[in-house]
Structure formats: structure tokens, C-alpha cells
């Protein structure tokens, strides 16, 4: 029984073996038994491999029997029966024919099985197509004498190889393809006859019609109707005629065509096409905006630079800031650029590795073990306990006195250490760096006694040297071309540290070359193995590789297909969140697709499925390591949801579908409230004490994205209230309803401004309890202060200008009704009160941002320097760095 439910008889035994009831080897023309007993009358009663109907699949058999492949098969068998007598007289030719026949049939059956074993999704696409078996390689032809049936020796081309076939999907059957090809050849032959003047007799050059005249007629009529429809639409959409076919004056004609409907009348409705990824800002406008980095990855759809180029309101903020710096801060800008270039020219790769003394290093490693208690689950490739004897072995011989100090430090010359020692020093470096980030990011592990405080200060002082060590180690590993499992473990741990501790919210400053994934594939860790240690290493690399790309909205291309990863999952953390990662990878496949138009309805459906998948995975996290690990999954999910919902807002705003815009806006505000609570609650959870380093920086990046999206909503609310107010002033009569409507719009934008300021206050309070400043948090506070000054400047000038004169701005807030404005205000107030109670915030309204943020002690929303958005010559460098981060 084959996979189609057909019973297939074995090739029958010869008549002599059947009479004697012995096993037959079915060799033609004479089987082994007949040859052994010298019986030359060996013959076979039936054709081998003939299909017979089965009781369970008679319908399937009838369908298959009518197919183009078996029809051609039976036709060839009729020819072979006529020559069977001749072939039996020639053993060599008969055996060759039999081998060719069996090979051809086997290749066809194998190809058919491969087609049937495809996934259901692929089958759904192929159901309406026909598979053509085209030879993918030409077998070698050798001129060799073959004895023919009449005993004469004739040189023939002997095929040296089986008939190899390749599957090619086509919307036509084989009969249709042959008919089209024959018509083409006949047409070329007619042209040759016309050119040469020679006529070929005995050849029918009439163009062959389709096998079904009725079908041909219906196709012809349908094609003619579609052609007329397309032609009429082209004239109409080009502005030559109207819908009734009447000509339109040339001055009123439209200069463009709807290319999709011209090509396919049944193309998807343009109101259902998701095309917001097409940049809304002109290329000239984007080129003027030098303030933001230009070397962004164009496939990073969840990146703020990518969003700015598609939202004219958000673009306006950065464009105004760009113009301000060009006109009023040109001098400080040139000084900053010159200083950067000087630092880059003087920077180099050190050939020395510096560490604290042996005793301090061992104490710090023990501190790591007591602080990061879940290190075995979260960082399975880092073994701190194994580093203690290595420190004891390597450090004593390289310890020296510090100049002008009684303290000791350990120095290694790079050229004098072996490859194994180099990797061990790399693990020690990363262990100390992760320990610093762990102690600095938590506010729940205070350093009360002097001994621990002094130890932390020593670690902080060595921070630049440890980062320099990391750069030197990476350069030396590449220089020595080291490629083994231990090197891979170090590279993967370094990539993890780079991902979780990156102080930039953009991928523009650090190019990810996926060194860990490429080396792992080179060492074949992505294929099934029995080595448990190798499997754990691969699971760790796979998870972090997907995290890095999914957070930025990129497709993890190297792992986007199932055949690239056959290694089993034994890491319980990856096993828990694999389904969510796999779903997000498939989502990126669809969003990054270049060969199809994206559907708005499908994206909305995928968003709902993503939400349900995240809930399922989160509910499965029951242990502390799984909960900590799931925080990164949740951050990737929330970051994706924020961007997708905001892109939908832009899409419906462009289509002027205000009902859908308001619906998505409600979902976005609810998601924003949940995200703010999620981020700040994780930073104050005692369960995560010492492990905040795994998610703190990505949490701040999500907060920064949300703040800029809130700014874009504020600009829309401000623009709609300003235009409504201007319309009321121009109108001779203003009713109470319009005034109330405008007051609600003003109230909404004020609440959005209040939410942004409250986020800054919470971040400021968090930094007060940190041991040292977090650069990413500091930059976000600076951004919020700049945004606050920008908002005050808008309120004072009350000017609404377009960010791009070539682009007509639609404002989704202008289509919100009065009832919806009340509901919107309620949602915004819930977000505001969930952060800080407004009464308490008003008491602290004039408090200053701690730790010298912006280089001044100005209040968060003070009126100082609002005309320059808070920029001064003193704080220009800090603000410029924060805006570009």
C-alpha cells in the first residue's frame, strides 16, 4: 500500500517458477531458476508494477489513473508490448530497456512522495498547480554498438545514467504545455518557410486547439472581458475617460495609474493593504536630517529611526531640533566632532591585559557567585567556580606593584599567553564585568559595610581596563584564527554581554556580525549531536541570536528555516519560550516579505495570536530562572506590540479610517499602561535582586520608544486642538459644543505631557538609589527634558507646520468624536495615575533631576531656555549625545 492508498502488486513470477511453486528472482528475460535448470522457455504472464484498485481508495485510484503521468505511462506500455517478442530475442537490449523503465518509474514515484510529504501550508499553495518533471541533468551519451533485434550491429547512443527528474510547479498540465510548445514550434517553422521560400510537405501546421473546446471558449471570453475591463479602467484611472467611458478634459485628467489593478483586476483592495513601511517622508527631507545616524539597518522595523522616517509628526520634532543646532549651536557642534575624531585617531589596540590582584579577583568571583544565584540557569556556559583555580595558577607570576601605590595589580602580555590562557582570561574579564553590572543595576542589594563598598569601588575603577581587555581579547582571537568549542563559548558570552548591556537604543553604532552563530554553524553545533555540553552551548547561542534580531524587528535569517537547526532542546529555559520565539520568527517572515503585499487584516490577526502566545508562555514560567528569562521575552513582545500598533495607527490615519484609528488607539494606550507597570515593577522586585542586569537596558529602550510615541500623540492632539480653535475664530458663530470639544482636546494633550514628565521623575528616583549612573537612563531623562522644553515652546508659539512640504499630513485625532475624546481622556488619566498620584507629583513638581542631569539644576518642566529646547553651550555635548543615542 503506497501513500495514496493504492495497492501495488509485485512483479509476477515467471510461469515455470509459479508451476513449481518456488521463489523467482524475476530477472528478465530468463530468471535465475530457469537459467540454472537450462529452461529457455521462461516467460512472464503480466506487466510488472501495474496498479489495482483497493476497496479503501477506489476513488483515489480513478483520479490518479486519469492523470497525465499514468496516461503517458500506459501509452508507453502499449508500445513496449508490441516489441516484447523482439526484446526477448535480444537479452542485452531487453535488460537495458528494463533497467531504464524501472529507474524512470522509481524517480517518478520518489518525486511524487516528496511532493505529498510537504507541509500543509505548502500543499495549500500547490493544490491548484501541476508538477512537471523536467530532467535536471543531461546524462552522458556514448556511441556504442548495440545488437538490434535483426542481429545487425548498429552504433547507437547508449544513455549512461538513470532518468533524473526535477519537480517544477506550473499552473498548466503537461498536455497544455506540450500544446503551447507545439504551437510555438509550428509558428517558428512557418516563419522559416516564409524566409527561405521552401515548403515542407506532410506536416500539419495548423495550430492545435485545446482539448476542451468549451473550456477554451470560456477562457477566451473571460480573457476578452478582463482585457476590456482593464483597458476601460486604465483609461478611467488615467483620467482619459470617466466611469461611463465619456472623455475627460485634459486639464482634469489624473497623471497616475493604479498599477496593481491594471495588472490584476481582482487585486486586493487598497484599503486593506498594509503599506506604511513605504517612507512617508521624502528622500530630500530625510537627507536633511543629519541629526540621526544614517547607517541604520533598513530591515530593522522596530527601531526608532525607522519609525521617524514614517511619522511626519515625530519627524517634525527632530527636524526642528536639527534646524536649531544648525543655526544657533554650529560652533559647539564642530568642537564636538573634532574631539570625537581626535579620540578615534589616538585610540588603538592595547597589547596588555590588566586585572586586580589575585586576592581581590578571587573575592570578586566569590561575590559573583553570591549575588547572581541563578547563574547556572541563565548563563550555563560561564563556570565561575572553575575560574578560581585558574586565577590561583596564573595570577601570582604576573602580579606587580602599582606605581606610587602599595596596591598590587596583575598584568599579562598578550604575546606571552597561550590560546587556552587567553580564553580563560577572557572568561575572567566577562565575569567581572557582569558582576559590576549586577551590583550597579540593582537597588535591592545595598553595600552597607565599608569592605563591600571598597570592593565595589575597586571594581568600578578597573571598569575601563576590563573593557579594554575585552577589545584586546577579541582582536587577538581573530588574529590567531581561533575556532573551537571553547572559543565559541567565549564569543557567545561576549555577544550576550554586548546585547544586554548595550547603552545605545539603536543598532547604528554597533554592527552585529553574528560571530557566535557563524562559528557555531562552522563547528556544526546546529546539527544533532550526543554531546550534552555542545547542545547546551547551541541552545544558549540560538536563543540569544533570536533575541538580538527580534528585538530590533529583524528576521533571524540564519535560523529562519527548520533544516538549519536539528539540534534538540535540553535547556529548560529555551524549551519554555521556544514556541513564542518561533511564532515571532514567522511573524518577521511575513512583515519582511518582499514578494507580496501585506494585509492589514492579517497583521491584526497576527497581533492577537502573538498576545495569546505570550500569555501561554508566561503562565508556564513557574521557577525563578524561568521568570527572569521570560522578562526578556516579554520585553521583545511588548516592543513588537508597541511598534505594530503604532504602525497600524499610521496606516489608518493615512486611509482616514478614523473609526479603526480610534480602536487601535485604545489598544495602544492599554498596552502602554501595562508596559509602564511591567518595566517599573520589575526594577523593584526582590525576586530579581542581582539579576536586573539581564533586562534593565532593554527595559529603558522600550521606555524610550514609548516616550517618543507619546510625543507623536501629543503633537497630533496639539495640532487638532490648534486647528479647531483657529476654525472657531474664523467662524462667525461658535457654539458651546465646539468649545467643549476643543477643551477636551486640550485636556488630552496636557495629560500626555504629564505622563512624560512622570516617567522622568520615576527614572530620576531610581537613579538616586543606583551605585553609579546608568548611561542609558541618563540619556532618556535628558531626552524627556528636551521634549518638555519643546512642548512648552509649541504652547507659546502655537505654530503648526508640516515636517515635509511635499507630504500632506493627515491627523487621526481630528476625526475623534466628543464621546471618544472623553473615553480617551479617561484612558490617559488611568496611565497617569498608575505612575504617580497627581497630588503627590504636584508637590514635587519643582524638584530637580539628580546627579547633574543636563549639567544644571533646573526643574524637569521649568521655563528656562524653552526657546532653545533647553540647550545651552554648557550642556550641548550631553544633549547631543542623548538625542543620537
UniProtKB/Swiss-Prot annotation:
Pfam families noted in UniProt: Zn_clus
Q: Which residues form a coiled coil?
A: none
GO MF terms, alphabetically ordered:
DNA-binding transcription factor activity, RNA polymerase II-specific; sequence-specific DNA binding; zinc ion binding
User: One GO cellular component from the entry?
Assistant: RSC-type complex
Q: Where in the cell is it found?
A: Nucleus
Q: Which CDD domains match?
A: GAL4
**What GO biological process terms are annotated to this protein in UniProt?**
chromatin remodeling; nucleosome disassembly; positive regulation of transcription by RNA polymerase II; regulation of DNA-templated transcription; regulation of nuclear cell cycle DNA replication; transcription elongation by RNA polymerase II
Residues in the DNA-binding region are: 14-42
Q: Which residues carry this modification: Phosphoserine?
A: 95, 236
- Entry keyword annotation includes Cell cycle: no
> What keyword terms does UniProt attach to this protein?
Chromatin regulator, DNA-binding, Metal-binding, Nucleus, Phosphoprotein, Transcription, Transcription regulation, Zinc
PROSITE patterns for this protein: ZN2_CY6_FUNGAL_1, ZN2_CY6_FUNGAL_2
Does the record carry Plastid as a key word?
no
**What does the record give as the function of this protein?**
Component of the chromatin structure-remodeling complex (RSC), which is involved in transcription regulation and nucleosome positioning. RSC is responsible for the transfer of a histone octamer from a nucleosome core particle to naked DNA. The reaction requires ATP and involves an activated RSC-nucleosome intermediate. Remodeling reaction also involves DNA translocation, DNA twist and conformational change.
Query: Oligomeric state and partners?
Result: Forms a heteromer with RSC30. Interacts with LDB7 and NPL6. Component of the two forms of the RSC complex composed of at least either RSC1 or RSC2, and ARP7, ARP9, LDB7, NPL6, RSC3, RSC30, RSC4, RSC58, RSC6, RSC8, RSC9, SFH1, STH1, HTL1 and probably RTT102. The complexes interact with histone and histone variant components of centromeric chromatin. Component of a fungal-specific module (HTL1-LDB7-NPL6-RSC3-RSC30) within the RSC complex.
Miscellaneous comment? Present with 1750 molecules/cell in log phase SD medium.
Protein known as: Chromatin structure-remodeling complex protein RSC3
Q: Can you name the source organism?
A: Saccharomyces cerevisiae (strain ATCC 204508 / S288c)
